[in-house]
């Protein structure tokens, strides 16, 4: 609801906050994705796209049902965590099957582009 969105945005107004991380519970599940998109739109509008939005999901990028999310986030970390593929050396993900996808570059190139630090 709008009250929750406003609260999240207010918390993120602090200058040391560089962006918004959305994870847990499965944010891109069909029951959740519309609310997540609404939050992302409001966040981007408020900060004029100056702060990044990252989403962690168990879905593969190609299988996300509501593709509109691609227009509102910067990075998607996709794929289910797999304990047997756990590697503590990985950045931003827990297992080697997961991808850290640069969504804006992926859309520009029409193929998966991995995020590089």
Regions found by a protein language model. Name each.
Residues 10-14, 58-117:
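Auxiliary Fe-S-binding modules of radical SAM enzymes
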Residues 1-55, 59-66:
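Conserved Radical SAM active-site core
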């Amino acid at each position: 609801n709008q009250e929750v969105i406003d609260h999240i945005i207010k918390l993120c107004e602090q200058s040391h906050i560089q962006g918004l991380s959305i994870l847990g519970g499965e944010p891109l599940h069909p029951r959740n994705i519309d609310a997540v998109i609404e939050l992302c739109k409001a966040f981007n509008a408020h900060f004029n796209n100056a702060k990044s939005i990252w989403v962690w999901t168990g879905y593969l990028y190609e299988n996300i049902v509501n593709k509109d999310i691609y227009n509102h986030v910067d990075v998607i970390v996709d794929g289910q965590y797999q304990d047997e593929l756990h590697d503590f050396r990985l950045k931003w993900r827990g297992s080697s099957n997961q991808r850290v996808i640069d969504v804006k570059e992926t859309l520009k190139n029409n193929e998966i582009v991995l995020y590089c630090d």
